[in-house]
Design a protein with these regions (language model features):
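Post-DEXD/H (motif II) to motif III coupling segment of the RecA-like Helicase ATP-binding lobe
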Residues: 147-205
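Conserved RecA-like helicase motor-core motifs
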Residues: 86-87, 91-92, 111-119, 249, ...
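Conserved RecA-like ASCE ATPase "motif II neighborhood" in helicase/translocase motors
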Residues: 106-165, 278
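Conserved helix-turn-beta segment of the N-terminal RecA-like "Helicase ATP-binding" lobe
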Residues: 96-117, 190-195
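Conserved Walker A/P-loop ATP-binding site and its immediately adjacent core
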Residues: 62, 66-74, 85-108, 182-184, ...
């Protein structure tokens, strides 16, 4: 029995069953929009010189569904490219156990052991040097590829920053970022036949920074250690919402002295009618 084919069959079956179950229970399933974008990105790898195209940069705003697009892309590669799901790795430039936990919850069991943050990449460093036919997703790539951190160093030592090596071993790297300036500048040093850039347009129902600015929901930061700034916050809330009760979160500085002054100011400015908690 071919173990790779078995892994593919298990993955595809579990993926499709999981998506069906989540849609029926209105859980976190992959949307048609995310599947559509994943197919576009997958197709970009095979438009021209497909044997040389080994890198893709996905640019998308924060919290607009990048994880769903990655899930859909893994499905496309396993279904259409004969990729062993055990050869799919998902990394982040962040040092965050919480990110790993949340990401694993979104993926099929067979891929979960291959999800790492930057300080745990050493667990599969040897695999990076020898595996072929591999797909690597790099989230927060502007951090991940810095040579001073673990991911950058391991990529360098494993030959994954060498284009010829990537082509020979059939390794594709898909980078994801909402702030791609550094990644783009590095990418443009490569031959254009080796990469593609996919800029994901946010769906109409996406609420990002620009929409918050347009709706007058973002204000200049001012120190809450100044009681006049706390009074300004209260006035702004009352003008905008009147007696329509809402929850408002005020972030307090971690500095003990500043936090004490801030909480004292809040106590002095807001009265019992505001029903505030400190």
């Amino acid at each position: 029995m071919d173990l790779k084919i078995t892994n593919q069959s298990i993955y595809l079956h579990n993926f499709e069953e999981n998506e069906k179950r989540l849609k029926e229970t209105e859980g976190k399933f992959i949307t048609d929009y995310q599947f559509e974008k994943a197919k576009e990105i997958y197709k970009d790898f095979y438009d021209i010189d497909c044997d040389k195209k080994i890198l893709s940069l996905i640019v998308a705003e924060t919290q607009m569904g990048k994880t769903g697009i990655i899930q859909a892309l893994t499905y496309e590669f396993v279904k259409n490219d004969n990729i062993n799901p055990l050869n799919i790795f998902i990394l982040t430039g962040l040092s965050s156990c919480e990110w790993v936990k949340q990401t694993k919850e979104r993926f099929i069991d067979i891929i979960r052991p291959n999800i790492f943050h930057r300080n745990t990449i050493g667990k599969f460093a040897e695999s990076l040097k020898i595996l072929k036919d591999m797909i690597i997703f790099l989230d927060e790539v502007h951090i991940a590829t810095e040579l001073k951190n673990e991911i950058g160093r391991n990529f360098l030592n494993s030959g994954l920053l060498n284009i010829d090596n990537l082509i020979e071993r059939n390794i594709k790297i898909i980078q994801i970022s909402a702030t791609p300036d550094i990644a783009l500048s590095e990418l443009y040093k490569w031959d254009e036949t080796n990469y593609n850039v996919s800029i994901i347009k946010s769906p109409d129902n996406y609420i990002g920074i620009q929409k918050l600015l347009d709706n007058n929901q973002i204000f200049e930061y001012k120190s809450l250690t100044d009681i006049n700034n706390v009074k300004e916050i209260k006035q702004t809330i009352h003008i905008k919402y009147g007696n329509n009760f809402k929850y408002h979160l005020l972030r307090v500085h971690t500095n003990v002295c500043d936090s004490y002054i801030t909480m004292k100011n809040i106590n002095n400015v807001f009265d019992d009618d505001d029903k505030f908690l400190v």
